C-alpha cells in the first residue's frame, strides 16, 4: 500500500471546503488526492487505475497486476464528479449514464466501493 501523503485533518478540511463550494485549485487538488488515498486504503491492489486529471491517480482493487504500459482496467473522471461519487452525491450508474465516467476493462467498476464517505447534501 502506498504511503499516505495527506493527513486526515488536511484531507477532511479540504473535502469540507470543496463540498461547501470552494473551487480553488489547492482545495480541489487536496480533496481529490485525499479521496484517492482513501480508495486505495479501502480497496488495496493494482488491478484498476483511477485517474482524476489533473490532480491524481491511484491503483486499487485486488487482482491481476499490470507492470508495463496502460493498465487494462482504467477509470477516468473529472474532479467534481469524483468528489460527488466518493461522497455519495451521485451514484455510479447515474455518472456512467451521464457520461461523467470513462471506464474500460472488466474490473473498471467501483459501484460496490462507493461512496467512500457520506456527507450531508
Where are the regions that the model predicts?
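Feature captures hydrophobic
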Residues: 1-121
